[in-house]
Amino acid sequence: MRLNKFIAETGFCSRRKADELINEGRVTVNKHEAIIGMDVKPEDVVKIDGERVKLNTKYEYYILNKPKRVICSNEDKFGRRLAVDFIKSRARLFTYGRLDFMTEGLIIISNDGEVYNHVMHPRKKLYKSYIAKVSREIEDKDIEALQHGVVIDGKRTAPAKVKKIDKKELRIAIFEGRNRQIRKMLETLGYNVNSLKRIKVGELTLGNLQVGEYRTLNEDEIKYLKSL
């Protein structure tokens, strides 16, 4: 098994992050510094920053309805609440498909490092759906603009799927994952975003979860996630 895949399957981090750690010289195999692309066996001793990592025997998969003012990270120097803190588990958990500090809604949390490749890798083009409430009435020309792509940070966005729900509310689905993308898309068109909530990732939905609640994925959802 490739070392980066081994590290991902321990739940420590994604394959991409594992390669970064290897390049930084923070990974050893049997007391020797690791190199990119090397293979390891289950009995090999793999350490990151001097701490051994082992393959998980059981993976856990959750969906959290993230509240506002919660961080999608495993640490925060300002002491703000973390999304993983909502989950009652002893496993080392990570969030996949980040939401910014003021956005609420569906976030996937797991100790399976391979989730990154299923959900977040750019080549997947997995649509994520949001409900946005804005400061003024939404004009039809702006819906068309979103559907064709708008320029943010000097680069045009991919076409979005957009449906007007009410005068100041719309549903928008995108497959890109640029920083604060939907907020920036709407701000570029002159709208202030009053609230933003993610309701769907691919075919995974919040269901009846209230803000701050979570649930485990069922078998069909896990199979779907791994099929992506």
Question: Predicted segments — roles?
Answer:
Residues 1-228:
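Basic, flexible Lys/Arg- and Gly-enriched helix-loop patches that mediate nucleic-acid binding at interfaces
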